[in-house]
Amino acid sequence: MKGTYYINHGDPLMYLKKHIKLRQFLEGWQENVVIEKPKSILIISAHWDTNVPTVNFVEHCDTIHDFDDYPDPLYQIQYRAPGAPNLAKKVEELLKESGMECEIDTKRGLDHAAWFPLMFMYPEANIPICELSVQPSKDGIHHYNVGKALSPLLQQGVLIIGSGGTVHPSDDTPHCPNGVAPWAIEFDNWLEDALLSGRYEDVNNFKKLAPNWEISHPGQEHLYPLHVALGAAGKNPKTQLIHRSWAANGVFGYSTYNFTPTTQKTD
């Protein structure tokens, strides 16, 4: 594959609202973003947190409805994609070769950070999928190094996607329905500038440098998939902003990025 991606999985209510810009972007994925059909997909999920990197090793992916108090139709959705056990084993091998731990989960399916965006991106559900967890107790550098260890997968036709939320405050954060909250814009702009300028060490150390990161990412698990995708693109990749929109509440940001290796061989 030509690069890695960091996407926003969005709110499950997007299933009922066709006008949402993020949904329209995801629906145009195969036509406008990744034309080539990947052999398999490795998706790093903000909604699977573990102590050490863990991959699901399954033949068929169950659909996990890991959200509460949503309309009944959302709980009827089934994304019946095949699993990618061979990819899971390769992820385990690459991480352990890099001196990291990796565990295998033989039961877990796909949570909504995985199946929900993929339902719009690849509605055919015919591409093998492997899910990788994040470690909220770790930092950006750890997740970048996880991605770096996985960069050889790009040469094997694997589409690597980090799925989270670029600005993802807690649910009780005051909304800004008449626009976008200034603190959210400031964080989003800082992240864009750091990525497009190649200041990847700053991105890895966002807790020391990014304005308003505490409110933008109180748990950080929704940003760490970005670090994995960034690391997986190899040394000094080129970053491109490929989508930007905001939730109607003015506090959840959906900026989406592509990380392209600067050489044919990643490292």
Swiss-Prot record:
<dbReference type="GO" id="GO:0005737">
    <property type="term" value="C:cytoplasm"/>
</dbReference>
<comment type="function">
    <text>Opens the cyclic ring of dihydroxy-phenylalanine (DOPA) between carbons 4 and 5, thus producing an unstable seco-DOPA that rearranges nonenzymatically to betalamic acid. Produces mainly (S)-betalamic acid. Required for the coloration of flowers.</text>
</comment>
<keyword id="KW-0479">Metal-binding</keyword>
<feature type="binding site">
    <location>
        <position position="9"/>
    </location>
    <ligand>
        <name>Zn(2+)</name>
    </ligand>
</feature>
<dbReference type="GO" id="GO:0008198">
    <property type="term" value="F:ferrous iron binding"/>
</dbReference>
<comment type="pathway">
    <text>Pigment biosynthesis; betalain biosynthesis.</text>
</comment>
<dbReference type="InterPro" id="IPR004183">
    <property type="entry name" value="Xdiol_dOase_suB"/>
</dbReference>
<dbReference type="Pfam" id="PF02900">
    <property type="entry name" value="LigB"/>
</dbReference>
<feature type="binding site">
    <location>
        <position position="168"/>
    </location>
    <ligand>
        <name>Zn(2+)</name>
    </ligand>
</feature>
<keyword id="KW-0560">Oxidoreductase</keyword>
<dbReference type="GO" id="GO:0046148">
    <property type="term" value="P:pigment biosynthetic process"/>
</dbReference>
<keyword id="KW-0223">Dioxygenase</keyword>
<protein>
    <recommendedName>
        <fullName>4,5-DOPA dioxygenase extradiol</fullName>
        <ecNumber>1.13.11.29</ecNumber>
    </recommendedName>
</protein>
<dbReference type="GO" id="GO:0050297">
    <property type="term" value="F:stizolobate synthase activity"/>
</dbReference>
<feature type="binding site">
    <location>
        <position position="222"/>
    </location>
    <ligand>
        <name>Zn(2+)</name>
    </ligand>
</feature>
<keyword id="KW-0963">Cytoplasm</keyword>
<comment type="similarity">
    <text>Belongs to the DODA-type extradiol aromatic ring-opening dioxygenase family.</text>
</comment>
<keyword id="KW-0408">Iron</keyword>
<dbReference type="GO" id="GO:0008270">
    <property type="term" value="F:zinc ion binding"/>
</dbReference>
<feature type="binding site">
    <location>
        <position position="47"/>
    </location>
    <ligand>
        <name>Zn(2+)</name>
    </ligand>
</feature>
<keyword id="KW-0862">Zinc</keyword>
<dbReference type="InterPro" id="IPR014436">
    <property type="entry name" value="Extradiol_dOase_DODA"/>
</dbReference>
